[in-house]
Amino acid sequence: MGLHLGLIDYGMGNLHSVEKAFNRLGHQPSRVVNPSDLDGCDALVLPGVGSFDPAIDNLQSTGLIPDLKRWNEADRPLLGICLGLQLLFESSAEGRLEGLGLIKGHVERLPIGAGARIPHMGWAPLDLRRANPMLAAADPLAWVYFVHSYAAVPERPETLAAAASFGSSSVTAMVWQRRLGACQFHPEKSSDSGSAMLKRWLDWLQRGAPIG
């Protein structure tokens, strides 16, 4: 039996490009627009493009927030992408609403004095800090595509899975916490590197999403 992926549709995600990326890997995600759509899902993908507060507002309107928290408490796989990563944290300097709080920490604006233009837009190599279901230490250097003005700051250092350079600073590129992971970059727009990472995540799910 194949994996049943749920793609959370709350009106602010780049759903079409994410769907196409999974289609190329032989998977057809189902769109999740309300709690009943979670039935039968093996793993969830939370994409996102836009601003923090409108995204939280939209998620609240779907009624999915309590279910996403229960999903995480049950240690079930979830992958956040771009704004989807930021929503996993407790709060953001971009807005006033509470985040999902699935990962301890906050989202802050990229540093103005780092000698780089905001938004951070374009390709950058990943600095792997901890092997995870999307990226292993033996993998080739991964160049990935970013578009963002804010970056997460995890409270626990071990949550940081990969970083990227932003001028003279280093910012969060990936986080991982048991079966909950996320990337600030867009794997669906990151050519072969992004496709390889999504495939690795799918293979991990097929193996039962082992921890460690």
From Swiss-Prot:
It comes from the Bacteria. Its main location: cytoplasm. It is found in: Cytoplasm. One of its GO terms (biological process) is L-histidine biosynthetic process. One of its GO terms (cellular component) is cytoplasm. Residues 4-211 form the Glutamine amidotransferase type-1 domain. Pathway: Amino-acid biosynthesis; L-histidine biosynthesis; L-histidine from 5-phospho-alpha-D-ribose 1-diphosphate: step 5/9. The active site is at residues 82, 186, 188. Its EC number is 4.3.2.10, 3.5.1.2. It catalyses: 5-[(5-phospho-1-deoxy-D-ribulos-1-ylimino)methylamino]-1-(5-phospho-beta-D-ribosyl)imidazole-4-carboxamide + L-glutamine = D-erythro-1-(imidazol-4-yl)glycerol 3-phosphate + 5-amino-1-(5-phospho-beta-D-ribosyl)imidazole-4-carboxamide + L-glutamate + H(+); L-glutamine + H2O = L-glutamate + NH4(+). PROSITE patterns: GATASE_TYPE_1. Gene3D superfamilies: 3.40.50.880. The keyword Methyltransferase does not apply. InterPro entries: Class_I_gatase-like, GATASE, Imidazole-glycPsynth_HisH. Keywords: Amino-acid biosynthesis, Cytoplasm, Glutamine amidotransferase, Histidine biosynthesis, Hydrolase, Lyase. Pfam families: GATase. GO terms for molecular function: glutaminase activity; imidazoleglycerol-phosphate synthase activity; lyase activity. IGPS catalyzes the conversion of PRFAR and glutamine to IGP, AICAR and glutamate. The HisH subunit provides the glutamine amidotransferase activity that produces the ammonia necessary to HisF for the synthesis of IGP and AICAR. Heterodimer of HisH and HisF. NCBIfam families: IMP_synth_hisH (TIGR01855). This is Imidazole glycerol phosphate synthase subunit HisH 2. It comes from Parasynechococcus marenigrum (strain WH8102). The gene is hisH2.
